From Swiss-Prot:
Subcellular location per the Swiss-Prot or TrEMBL entry: Cytoplasm
Name of protein: Phosphoribosylformylglycinamidine synthase
Keywords, alphabetical: ATP-binding, Cytoplasm, Glutamine amidotransferase, Ligase, Magnesium, Metal-binding, Nucleotide-binding, Purine biosynthesis
Function of the molecule: Phosphoribosylformylglycinamidine synthase involved in the purines biosynthetic pathway. Catalyzes the ATP-dependent conversion of formylglycinamide ribonucleotide (FGAR) and glutamine to yield formylglycinamidine ribonucleotide (FGAM) and glutamate.
Keyword Iron-sulfur: no
Domain of life: Bacteria
Active site feature: 1134, 1259, 1261
Gene source species: Pectobacterium atrosepticum (strain SCRI 1043 / ATCC BAA-672) (Erwinia carotovora subsp. atroseptica)
Gene behind this protein: purL
EC number: 6.3.5.3
Region (Disordered): 303-325
InterPro entries xref list: Class_I_gatase-like (IPR029062), FGAR-AT_N (IPR040707), FGAR-AT_PurM_N-like (IPR055181), PurL_large (IPR010073), PurL_linker (IPR041609), PurM-like_C_dom (IPR010918), PurM-like_C_sf (IPR036676), PurM-like_N_sf (IPR036921)
BP GO annotations: 'de novo' IMP biosynthetic process
């Protein structure tokens, strides 16, 4: 084993945070230093050249200090017997670099700790703080890492002796294996195996438990119900299905696949033909929708829990029909109170929690990062979401009890597109090859389906932790590329049938695949890809290793499928064949036995049906006590409540521009304020049709009125999505995610009433369909503390996600107020005169619940509201729109003022004298801003839709900072907009300070309070409407551009589209094509290296990609020859920029180029940043010098690193800087967030001395269309100014 030191692993502020954690755990640690250390398992000793190559390969990240580290060593490595995702990718890079003697690379994190007084027990405590016990181990010596490369012998399966020991043997196995089997299921299995005349194997029982868990079978939603002694006519699921029976319009697939599908638009989908050339293909892009939850894993281990939640939902989308394309995501969190240190709020009492779960603060620190990281690396923008906190002692139908989200809600959902001929799955023919596509089996995520079906605290702590999966999004990206190549073949698609691998692992996915296809299956255990040979058959078959799909492929198409997988470097294994007989057989050639030999009907047959016999329980509650509520204090408190407060800390960590098809993200207007009501994407890169999604949820209301809470969730989703141009209400489709503490007194009956209110009443009345959803029925946490039983029970929580086809994405209206003309602010109040304050944000911040809550008072008025807003949107009669929701009218107005950077003066006298109720009630409705001149027209449209009595004139938006609310002649509330904005932002700021570089967080918080900030602005030195490439395109000559990607790159399609529009033939070139000599760069006039996460940023962002070129002699020469050839152009963007900066030795005139390293914030940054084009030789930026314009930024490692000040000065003196970050005043800046990575002198793009090669961190390809800019001047046409770059390239090539 070779040992090689790596780069420093933790920044100074990360070290400080670690020291603070030590102090919190009473561990007297004075100093910590951390660096990466690499371990290489080699077949034979490396020679000097190989050693030098390996040393250079493993040199990445910040420069390593010369000194030998001092202190007590704690070495954290992956768990012996496992192979980490880092190892797989680093080893791939080594092999691609010709280091064939390297069998495997692995990486550890060496902590050198100064703590002379720690005893053995404290050292163990410290070790526990530093590692994830499910995935990592701790050693005290570097040489002990040799255990990473030890090999273990496979373990055999075990039989459960029921023939001799009977029921007792099954009961013991139930507890030992964490199967969560009910009494009647134990009886069922006992009878089934007695009839078979044999003992079950452990793998068969585990497989049954996962396939029949509440998580997978949804027993409660399919149960029979008796409430208060009365048998109910329908199950919960039948009431949901009633919405489809009532309104099947526009739904193409419901309830029978991994996601639902509704009609989309006929557009030009942009992808490659059989020769790798990109072009538009006119076809239907139908819309798929799915929303999942991943609550249990997120409570145990937030980052991987949330990451695999997003990853699983993405796989659901990709595995719909015969393969489809995930497109854009949403995410949501409900947790207990944050209790931010130094920022604990008056309503946040400490109620305790069990040790096995993490705190709400930990969840919201790590969970969103995990979800965002997966979406980022996969290449899916996350565009909307919600965040609620609730934890309180309330008076309920069970007396006083604790309600909250100790078991959190982690919501992951999204939209995608699918071809019409692939919506329905194909036929699995007998003899079809049964395939696992994706990563290897690892001993993680065992029993997730069963574990998530139990109330937290019922299962064993080790089983809880074992049930959390770990993520590898770059692997999932590779698998999706395979699926994309398959569906793009149309009728020749080799995929007959596909499912994702989720809860229960292959033990659930493979039986589901063959059963759904009307077949059985015959499998070979040892053909499953396996990174841990020591696993038992149960562990191989049932683990929930992520990023896997199961497929059926016809034997005659296997060679084609193999070719696609090899090109994309996506691992796969043929593990069996489909059989005529409905039977599962698994052979194990290592032990020459059969761990599984089971009829499918035993596994998936008619297991006992559940009966829920429950009672309704209700409590009236006490009215809100208002004596101690003062308006000024109430406003500040409500603006601090997370459900109301700014959520920038949750948003800028997620890529919101990838695909180039994002028309409306969360950030609104020139000041990029996160207040958008819905997310909108374009259906393609050549149209204005699109898709929209929004969220609605009002969970605390269920503590008083279950049905009202459900109705409000539907209503809020509608008032949110109404902001874009949809058309008829029947175009909107809903996903319903139901969370409840089943078995908790009163909750079951309340759940039934809520489902009935939505499925049988409201949705049919509105013509709405719920074709997809999910339930999580174990939302209760139990534990013991100080000798007494404790429990925190979640409110019944319905999260509604609304999805719709969009007629014209350009008509989407935002909350940004306009002040350039006479205007009017109108409140459309759907409260029908009600101003209930029960279960509002106001009640929560004063630790009350109240009595009466908001509700949907008239489905007809709600439908009229939606239709009226749609008419106004289509007529372009609205200047701004924002729904009324959490926090009430005052929050709606404040957020609109924040987005417009203006003042507001309103009069609420027309709504009665109860100021508090008027401002803080959360009845459905919206505030619209209209031109004063169109008031009569707008009033007429509202009246036509039955809303005349709902409309109140409030006042107007105006220049300045004053926020004034009058009650007739009296000003009842006055405050500056900047003060309100500061209060609203403080929760996000405090979370950023805890999680990221506090210096950056402070700079952003200060910047928000600048009343004079002019916002994003544009000053161009050219006309973006001028097509300077047109004369060259007219010659009918299209130069070829190699659109270069490596595994993990995710921005190549929009890049190809930009070059295609500029007159190039864009050709898809995978690095595997060059390494295998299938393609050669001599055939191209231009090359573009695209953005993403090549190799998951293993060995440094872009560095592994670069070294696979530099260390492969033939490919190195090919690149060198291309760069030397005159009349060629090369562009590197984001990951491609990082990669090309490491190829500078091959690029003439690039020897001064810097490296790009970790952002100063130490966080992935997704921003819409203002840049200025510098005068430079760059041929891409020709005639653009002096222009200022915003551009999409999405990266974690974009900070320019130079050797010293002289190096920086040389770059400047040679005029190689092509782009710089500037602030809104037009000044070059290093301040965050105007400069999102902290680069010196604002540098974000450099060029070679000839100008033929340019590298840049921002993404021009994602904003070449005006419509994909988060904000833009209204006069821009189809093309945004960044299109000029690509047309410049076309002009240069003549």
């Amino acid at each position: 084993m070779e040992i090689l030191r790596g780069s420093p692993a933790l920044s100074a502020f990360r070290i400080n945070k670690l020291l603070v954690r030590c102090k919190e755990h009473l561990l007297p640690v004075s100093d910590i230093y951390a660096e990466y250390v690499h371990f290489a398992d080699v077949s034979t000793p490396l020679n000097n050249d190989e050693q030098a190559k390996l040393t250079r390969l493993l040199k990445y990240g910040p420069s390593l200090a010369e000194h030998e580290p001092q202190g007590h060593l704690l070495l954290v490595t992956p768990r012996p017997g496992t192979i980490s995702p880092w190892s797989s990718k680093a080893t791939d890079i080594a092999h691609n670099c010709g280091l064939s003697k390297v069998l495997r690379l692995e990486r550890g994190l060496a902590f050198y700790i100064h703590a002379p007084t720690l005893n053995d027990e404290q050292w163990q405590q410290l070790g526990a703080l530093l590692h994830d016990r499910m995935m990592e181990s701790v050693f005290s010596d570097l040489k002990q890492a040799a255990a990473l490369f030890s090999h273990h012998q496979p373990a055999p399966f075990k039989r459960i002796e029921i023939l001799l020991q009977g029921r007792q043997a099954l009961e013991e196995a139930n507890v030992r294996l964490g199967l969560a089997l009910a009494e009647d299921e134990i009886d069922y299995l006992l009878e089934a195996f007695n009839n078979l005349g044999r003992n079950p194997t452990d793998i068969e029982l585990y497989m049954f438990a996962q396939a029949n868990s509440e998580h997978c079978r949804h027993k409660i939603f399919n149960a029979d119900w008796v409430i208060d002694g009365v048998t109910q006519p329908k199950s919960l699921f039948k009431m949901i299905k009633n919405t489809f029976e009532h309104t099947p319009d526009h739904v193409l697939s419901a309830y029978k696949d991994n996601a639902a599908v509704m009609e989309g638009s006929a557009v030009g989908r942009f992808y490659t033909d059989a020769n790798g050339q990109y072009d538009y293909h006119q076809e239907d892009a139908h819309i798929l929708m799915k929303v999942e939850t991943h609550n249990h894993p997120t409570a145990i281990s937030p980052w991987p829990g949330a990451a695999t939640g997003s990853g699983g939902e993405i796989r659901d989308e990709g595995a719909t029909g015969r393969g489809s394309k995930p497109k854009a995501g949403l995410v949501g969190f409900s947790v207990s109170n944050l209790r931010i240190p130094g920022f604990i709020q008056p309503w946040e009492e400490e109620f305790g929690k069990p040790d096995r779960i993490v705190s709400a603060l930990d969840i919201m620190t790590e969970g969103p990062l995990g979800g965002a990281a997966f979406n980022n690396e996969f290449g899916r923008p996350a565009l909307t979401g919600y965040f609620r906190t609730y934890e309180e002692r309330v008076d309920s139908h069970n007396g006083e009890e604790l309600r909250g989200y100790h078991k959190p809600i982690m919501l992951a959902g999204g939209i995608g597109n699918i071809r019409g001929d692939h919506v329905k799955k194909g036929e699995i023919i007998v003899g079809a090859k049964l395939i696992v596509l994706g990563g290897p089996s690892m001993n993680i995520g065992l029993g997730g389906g069963a574990a998530s079906s139990m109330a937290s605290g019922q299962s064993d702590a080790d089983l809880d932790f074992a049930s959390v999966q770990r993520d590898n999004p770059e692997m999932e990206r590779r698998c999706q590329e395979v699926i994309d190549r398959c569906w793009q073949l149309g009728e020749a698609n080799p995929i007959l049938f596909i499912h994702d691998v989720g809860a229960g692992g292959l033990s659930n996915a493979m039986p589901e695949l063959v059963s759904d296809g009307g077949r059985g299956g015959r499998f070979e255990l040892r053909d499953i890809l396996n990174d841990e040979p020591g696993m038992s058959p149960l562990e191989v078959w049932c683990n929930e290793s992520q990023e896997r799909y199961v497929l059926a492929v016809a034997p005659e198409q296997l060679a084609q499928f193999d070719e696609i997988c090899r090109r994309e470097r996506a691992p796969y294994a043929v593990i069996g064949e489909a059989t005529e007989e409905l039977h599962l057989t698994m052979n194990d050639r290592h032990f020459n036995n059969q761990p599984i030999d089971l009829p499918l009907d035993v596994l998936l047959g008619k297991t006992p049906k559940m009966l829920r016999d429950v009672e309704r329980k209700q409590v009236e509650g006490t009215p809100l006590q208002r004596d101690d509520i003062y308006l000024a204090e109430a406003v500040e408190r409500v603006l601090h409540l997370p459900v109301v407060a700014e959520k920038t800390f949750l948003i800028t960590i997620g890529d919101r521009s990838v695909t180039g098809m994002v028309a409306r993200d969360q950030m609104v207007g020139p000041w990029q304020v996160p207040v958008a009501d819905c997310a909108v994407t374009t259906a393609s890169l050549d149209s204005y049709y699109g898709e929209a999604m929004s969220i609605g949820e009002r969970a605390p209301v269920a503590l008083r009125n279950f049905a009202a809470s459900a109705r409000l969730a539907v209503g809020e989703a509608l008032t949110n999505i109404a902001a874009t141009h949809i058309g008829p209400l029947t175009r909107v489709k809903l996903s319903a995610n139901w969370m409840a503490a089943a078995g908790h007194p009163g909750e079951d009956a309340g759940l039934y009433d809520a489902v009935k209110a939505v499925g049988e009443e409201l949705c049919p009345a509105l013509g709405l369909t719920i074709p997809v959803g999910k339930d999580s029925m174990s939302m209760k946490t139990r534990w013991q503390e100080e000798g007494e039983d404790r429990a925190v029970t979640s409110p019944m929580s319905l999260v509604i996600s609304a999805f719709a086809r969009v007629e014209d994405v350009r008509n989407t209206v935002t909350p940004q107020l306009r002040t350039g003309q006479d205007n009017a602010l109108l409140l459309i109040d759907l409260g029908a005169g009600n101003k209930a304050l029960g279960a509002t944000a106001l009640a929560q911040v004063y630790r009350q619940l109240g009595r009466k809550t908001a509700d949907v008072h008239s489905p007809e008025q709600l439908a009229g509201f939606f239709n009226a807003i749609q008419e106004l949107v289509a007529a372009k009669a609205l200047l701004a729109y924002h729904d009324r929701s959490d926090g009430g009218l005052i929050v709606t107005l404040a957020e609109m003022a924040f987005a417009g950077h203006c003042g507001v003066t309103v009069d609420i006298a027309s709504q009665g004298e109860d100021t508090l109720a008027t401002l803080f009630n959360e009845e459905l409705g919206a505030v619209i801003q209209i031109p004063a001149a169109r008031r009569a027209e707008v009033d007429a449209i509202l009246a036509l839709h039955g809303l005349a009595d709902c409309v109140h004139y409030l006042g107007q938006a105006e220049e300045g900072t004053r926020f004034t609310i009058n009650q007739g002649a009296e000003a009842v509330y006055q405050e500056s907009r900047s003060t309100l904005r500061r209060w609203w932002a403080e929760t996000s700021w405090q979370m950023q300070r805890l999680r990221d570089n506090p210096q950056c967080a402070d700079q952003e918080h200060i910047a928000r309070q600048d009343d004079n900030d002019p916002g994003l602005n544009v000053s161009l030195t050219f006309d973006p409407k001028e097509d300077i490439a047109a004369p060259y395109i007219a010659k009918n000559v299209r130069p070829k551009v190699a659109v270069l990607r490596e595994q993990g790159v995710n921005s190549h399609v929009e890049m190809a589209a930009a070059f295609h529009r500029a007159g190039f033939d864009a050709i898809d070139i995978h690095m595997s094509d060059l390494l295998a000599n299938r393609r050669n760069l001599q055939d191209f006039q231009a090359l573009v290296a695209c953005g993403g996460f090549s190799y998951g940023d293993v060995l440094g962002a872009g560095e592994g990609w670069a070294k696979s070129i530099l260390f492969n002699a033939r490919v190195r020469d090919e690149f060198a020859e291309f760069f030397l050839r005159p009349q060629t152009l090369a562009l590197g963007v984001c990951n491609g920029c990082q990669m090309m900066s490491n190829l500078r030795e091959l690029i003439p005139g690039a020897d001064l180029w810097p490296r790009f390293v970790r952002n100063k914030s130490d966080r992935f940054e997704a921003r819409f940043s203002l840049v200025e084009v510098d005068k430079s030789p760059s041929l891409f930026m020709n005639d653009m010098a002096g222009s200022r314009m915003p551009i999409a930024v999405s990266h974690g490692e974009g900070q320019v690193e130079v050797r010293d000040d002289a190096h920086l000065a040389a770059i400047e003196e040679h005029g190689l800087v092509a782009l710089r970050y500037i602030n809104h005043y037009g000044q070059v800046t290093e301040n965050y967030p105007a400069n999102p990575n902290g680069s010196s002198n604002g540098i974000t793009a450099v060029t070679s001395t000839s100008g033929r090669a340019t590298v840049m961190m921002p993404h021009p390809e994602r904003v070449f269309r005006t419509v994909s800019n988060s904000w833009h001047p209204e006069e821009w046409g189809e093309d945004g100014p960044w299109m000029r770059m690509f047309r410049n390239a076309r002009r240069q090539l003549g």
